[in-house]
From Swiss-Prot:
Belongs to the heat shock protein 70 family. The gene is dnaK. GO terms for molecular function: ATP binding; ATP-dependent protein folding chaperone; unfolded protein binding. Pfam families: HSP70 (PF00012). PROSITE patterns: HSP70_1, HSP70_2, HSP70_3. It comes from Malacoplasma penetrans (strain HF-2). Induction: By stress conditions e.g. heat shock. Acts as a chaperone. This is Chaperone protein DnaK. Gene3D superfamilies: 3.30.420.40, Actin, Chain A, domain 4, Substrate Binding Domain Of DNAk, Chain A, domain 1. Keywords: ATP-binding, Chaperone, Nucleotide-binding, Phosphoprotein, Stress response. Residues 596-621 are annotated as: Disordered. Residues 604-621 have a biased composition (Basic and acidic residues).
Length: 621
């Protein structure tokens, strides 16, 4: 008896310890830094667990999340569900990453949204998925961007994170993240790695040297307007031309038809990575004078590669530029990593092999490796991953405009960051009272040919002949690749500073307002999500039951069972139409039970028929 008493006390003690550990774990949850690959087509999230990066699945068990946002009935839907309704819902937005850092907006139901706001919806969904998987509140993230993203695009990404309720601890380049994931357990051996990163909307090449735990980016190059979407577009254009030629119909002005073509083109591209030929079948794509139009075409891999040869060739120069900047030849590269879903195309692998003389490493998942690397960087920032030092670079030259519209560089492209550089300038006219500091990004000699990042004025300069005042301009790039500029009059010590903001012009007040709106709508969004899930489940059950009733199972049950099933379906359809969510929620279990009973009855009736038939045959014999 005494032993039993002590055992019970010990069990209670263990339970209390578990509770304390859970509480401490939840308290520590805010210190977790997740790694996010915010992609053009798909996104992915990872976290460090037991010294290794782990991809976090969505509640549906998916390891990647389509970067698609849909607006429907005052509800915002993200991911797979949003992608599934792209054909029928015109208020569905994809590839928003291509607009990051611009002043462009997308309009939905008369309201304009910035690229940051749409990206924030994707990040918010990713954050929620991670929280559900880890059972903890997540507030910190490392987010990846294409290596060739400029300052405005990086700031826009950081702002999107803020709106989503994430403290963006670090912005790192996608190829660098991929190399981190690849080389985490190989960092002791010195070797050079070329990362060929072809995503949905961007293309990057980076060369890194890995040695003694240090990952040093030697060079980077790329094209921010080249990606898998462009390969899809080539197929779309081909289908449109084939239909014009064969059926004398132009589909290019039919939005719904074009969306169906987009889906079909993406599928054909993916399928052609494993097949030599695919069939593109699109029934009832449009209505013509002679009736519905069906598209039935065959596309071979050879034809596809011919259609997209110019796109593939556009990836060659960035590879050559990266090698030139790093002062390396192809033979100096030890490993080639292919990153991004678009690198699964056989033509990409063949091109890389022919240009670099070696086969790419196949031990990484091109869709997941970037998120895994971001999680490792998060681990470094948390102090959980030690003995790793990441030395990244700035992708483009940073300069100011000087007399005659000349672009004068302060920090050259592929300089290791963080970095700070200063230079003395002077006035261009006698008694000039102020200087206009125009900050530029790009490789061109003239200011007008480069991207303007921003400008500010340093005034209060004392009267003096031209060339006498000394104005010190300092450029400082932090570890996120974000630029701060300072101008100081050396005589008076008067200074002016600017942190380059993204060209979409979102102020801190606007960002704060968006964060507040997201927080205020949290409960409402959760309710709408639950309703959407109930609707989806109810519709699935109704469709499944109807299929059973009208199919073979329906023939195997008696009239009374069939009548009860039809009654339940009608009741469910009415509740769904009237949006009686609570009643639907409580009755879903009843409906599932009836569906199970229906299937069981059909099975039993079929078995009874078989037995009766067997008995009848035996009695005849």
């Amino acid at each position: 008896m005494r032993v039993l008493k002590y055992m019970l006390l010990y069990i209670l003690y263990l339970k209390s310890i578990v509770k304390i550990l859970r509480r401490l774990n939840n308290m520590a949850g805010s210190n977790i830094i997740i790694g996010i690959d915010l992609g053009t087509t798909n996104s992915c999230v990872a976290v460090m667990e037991n010294g290794k990066s782990k991809i976090l699945e969505t509640p549906e068990g998916k390891r990647t999340i389509p970067s698609v946002v849909a607006f429907k009935d005052n509800e915002i839907i993200v991911g797979d569900v949003a992608k599934r309704q792209m054909v029928t819902n015109k208020n569905t937005i994809s590839s928003i990453k291509r607009l990051m850092g611009t002043d462009k907006t997308v309009e939905v139901n008369g309201k304009k949204y910035t690229p940051e706001q749409i990206s924030a919806q994707i990040l918010s969904y990713i954050k929620k998925c991670a929280e559900e998987k880890l059972g903890q509140t997540i507030t910190k993230a490392v987010i990846t961007v294409p290596a060739y993203f400029n300052d405005a695009e990086r700031n826009a990404t950081k702002n999107a994170g803020k709106i989503a309720g994430l403290e963006v601890e670090r912005i790192i380049n996608e190829p660098t993240a991929a190399a981190l994931a690849y080389g985490m357990d190989k960092s002791k051996t010195e070797h050079k790695v070329l990362v060929y990163d072809l995503g949905g909307g961007t293309f990057d090449v980076s060369i890194l040297e890995i040695a003694d735990g240090t990952f040093e980016v030697l060079s980077t190059s790329g094209d921010n307007h080249l990606g898998g979407d462009d390969w899809d577009q080539k197929i779309i254009n081909w289908i449109v031309e084939e239909v014009k030629k064969n059926d004398k119909v132009d589909l290019s002005n039919d939005k719904m038809a074009m969306q169906r073509l987009k889906d079909a083109a993406e599928k054909a591209k993916i399928d052609l990575s494993g097949l030599k030929e695919v069939e593109i079948s699109l029934p009832f794509i449009a209505m013509t004078e002679s009736g519905p139009l069906n598209v039935d075409l065959k596309l071979t891999r050879a034809k596809f590669e011919d259609l997209t040869r110019d796109l593939l060739e556009r990836t060659i120069k960035p590879v050559e530029d990266a090698l030139k900047e790093a002062k390396l030849s192809a033979s100096d590269i030890h490993k080639v990593l292919l990153v991004g879903g678009s690198t699964r195309m056989p033509a990409v692998e063949e091109l890389v092999k022919s240009k670099l003389g070696k086969s790419p490493d196949k031990n990484i998942n091109p869709d997941e490796v970037v998120a895994a690397g971001a999680a490792i960087q998060g681990g470094v920032l948390m102090g959980d991953v030690k003995d790793i030092l990441l030395l990244d670079v700035t992708p483009l030259t940073l300069s100011i405009e000087t007399m005659g519209g000349v672009s004068t560089p302060l920090i050259k492209r592929n300089s290791t960051i963080p970095i700070s550089k200063s230079q003395i300038f002077s006035t261009a006219a006698d008694n000039q009272p102020a200087v206009d500091v125009h900050v530029l990004q790009g490789e061109r000699q003239m200011a007008a040919d480069n991207k303007s990042l921003g400008r500010f004025i340093l005034d209060g300069i004392e009267p003096a002949p031209r060339g006498v005042p000394q104005i010190e301009i300092t450029f400082n790039i932090d570890a996120n690749g974000i630029l701060n500029v300072k101008a100081v009059d050396k005589k008076t010590n008067k200074e002016a500073t600017i942190t380059i903001k993204d060209s979409s012009g979102l102020s801190q007040e606007e960002i704060d307002k968006m964060i507040k709106e997201a927080e205020e709508n949290k409960e409402k969004d959760a309710q709408l999500k639950e309703q959407q899930e109930i609707r989806y489940k109810a519709e699935s059950l109704i469709n499944m039951f109807k299929t059973s009733l009208n199919g073979e199972e329906g023939k195997k049950v008696d009239a009374k069972q069939k009548e009860e099933a039809e009654k339940m379906i009608n009741e469910f359809e009415t509740l769904l139409k009237e949006e009686k969510w609570d009643e639907l929620k409580t009755k879903i279990n009843q409906f599932e039970a009836m569906a199970s009973q229906f299937a069981q009855a059909a099975k039993q009736n079929e078995e009874k028929k078989e037995e009766d038939k067997k008995d009848s045959e035996e009695s005849k014999n």
